[in-house]
């Protein structure tokens, strides 16, 4: 089992990038939820409210995914910091195993989120 390795610094940069992106999605969910409330105020139709509930649930799920990702990334960051704390020159030359799982979860999350956003925008077009 050949595991890919990368420099500690590169992994750290990747983590920062993920956290920035997750921050962006967190803000975006807040905005989408506001739009959803507007729809609820304008429409009392049962069909619409069923869809509203669907999106509410989706936003909760995606928020949980974000929290889970952030948590995982922070654990990895702590592990990196421990390696560096033990040996401060490790940053320059030490390689660590590439964190494929987080990378995969991240792209899976982003794909899902973009699909959801598309679906939601179509819904808004119909009901706003």
Model-derived segments and their meaning:
Residues 2-128:
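Charge-rich amphipathic alpha-helical interaction elements
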